[in-house]
Amino acid sequence: MAGLDYPNLVLIRRKARGLAGRMVAGWQHERMIPEFVRRAVDLIESAGPEPFFLYFPMCPPHNPIVPAPEFVGKGGVTGRESRYADWVYQGDHMLGQILDALERTGLAGHTLVMATGDNGAAKRPYPPLREAKSSIYEGGHREPFVARWPGKIQANSVSHRTICL
């Protein structure tokens, strides 16, 4: 299985084989993810009065787990899961930078912001949901969805409706 997330990875009989070398000379995930955020913020800051659409698929919390050096040790967790916690912390920071840019530019008051996952938990079920990623059961496709739209969505409101993006 090869996909957009891992174009240099091929799964053969449940064994991962990476292709030799990097896809692009000099590519470093640790440095590129902050660059993606910088470019998103630049787009927001240069948007002007016309409506625009920004799709920003964040890498955290997906693999590869490669927090930038400035986030190492910031996740508040020690031991085996510390690197993953740093990665999730970096993801939170990334979203915060985008929200801050919307505030600074005065766009936050009339901008719909959505944050969601793309599938259920990857490796194990999380009760009360049954199963995990790639399953037809709820644990394979139910994930959090958060939306902020001042004047349209009440802050701290909860909806139990099914949505589809």
Stretches with model-predicted labels:
Residues 13-25, 71-79, 149-153:
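Short glycine/proline-rich turn/loop motifs
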Residues 21-34, 76-90:
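The substrate-binding groove and active-site-proximal loops of carbohydrate-active enzymes
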Residues 30, 34, 139, 159-163:
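Short, solvent-exposed loop/helix junctions and linker helices
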Residues 54-57, 114-116:
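Short beta-strand segments
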Residues 64-67, 76-81, 86-87, 93, ...:
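Histidine-centered active-site microenvironments of extracellular/periplasmic hydrolases
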